[in-house]
Regions:
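C-terminal alpha-helical "lid/dimerization" subdomain adjacent to the S-adenosyl-L-methionine
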Residues: 83-133, 137, 143
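Short beta->alpha hinge that forms the Motif I/post-I loop of the SAM-binding pocket
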Residues: 8-9, 58, 81
Length: 160
């Protein structure tokens, strides 16, 4: 049975995770940022980040830190929103994205978090640019796989 170290800069998110996974005793919870992890080097077999890399202040620094804390032979996996190559799907997605803040305001009374979400997705780098950054920051055998027509992608790389 392995251990899971969950890191998030948002205390409320960690509290939600603790509630959801209260029956698991192999998870530790840490407030922190991907750019400055408080773990020793060469510690982890896997490093995963989901829908968080685009929210970091410095993507390269975050990738360097991920590489640092991975053991040699460790694998980096990143699930993130990406760029859609199919023009028809992209057209539909862009128009759907315009209504997300309105729906958010209707459901939760706030549109700002959803406006931020759409802007952060729009300004995030594309799949090939992320592969390039992963390579520049020490990862090898980097690749990605589009899911849901490219709305999201899983990026993978190894510390050799």
């Amino acid at each position: 049975k392995g251990s899971v170290y969950n890191v998030d800069p948002n205390k409320k998110m960690l509290e939600q995770g603790k509630k959801r996974f209260k029956n698991l005793d192999n998870i530790s919870w840490h407030i922190g940022h991907a750019e400055n992890l408080k773990f020793k080097s060469n510690l982890f077999d896997y490093y995963t980040i989901s829908f968080g890399l685009r929210n970091t202040k410095d993507i390269s620094k975050s990738l360097k830190e991920a590489h640092r804390v991975l053991k040699p032979g460790g694998r980096f996996l990143c699930l993130e929103f990406s760029k859609i190559s199919n023009s028809n799907l992209n057209f539909l997605y862009k128009n759907y994205s315009k209504i997300i803040p309105k729906v958010g305001k209707f459901i939760v009374g706030k549109s700002e978090p959803y406006e931020y979400l759409i802007k952060s997705i729009d300004k995030f780098i594309n799949q090939n640019q992320l592969v390039e950054l992963m390579n520049k920051n020490g990862f090898e055998n980097c690749k990605y796989r589009d899911l849901s027509g490219g709305i999201v992608s899983i990026h993978s790389g190894w510390k050799v």
